[in-house]
Amino acid sequence: WILLLSEIFPDNDKTEVVAEYSNNIYELVQERVKDIPEKERERIFFLFKYSDTEMQTSGENFFGQFWAEAAGAVNAAEEIKTDNQVVVNMEQVYAWNPSMIFITNFTPAQPEDLYGNHMGSYDWSAVSAVEHEKVYKMPLGMYRSYTPGADTPVTLLWFAKTIYPELFEDIDMVQETKDY
């Protein structure tokens, strides 16, 4: 992504610095999550859009798959082969029963909306992530952090630390963000 931007904006001399930082973060995360057995990897669900009338997620061919795999997790909706986001129903979410939910910045929904069943007629109370209060709103950086962009390395580090805090307890996200 960064290298593509460097072709569009060739006069920017920070491309190599950003690309190197991105690669270093990716390698750091991979090194720390590589030994997690497949059956012990967190199953995460991306709530891409959410309203009173529908919910959308990310299947195997969209950004959520990258984030899940890069952070050492499993995309709970990876069985969906559609490109981009796709409408899903609550029964599918119950069947997937994700251990963590990440709400993107493409929706105004907040974790409290799921904890309290405040939107639509959906009942989230039986979903593991809600039961254990592991629902997170994705941070907003230079742009919406769900999509690839300049914030990608910091977003990956945030995902990894949020999903596996014990493996990344030495990482200070505030300092990493400032340094970046």
List each model region and its residues.
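N-terminal ligand-binding lobe of clamshell/alpha-beta domains
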Residues: 1-180
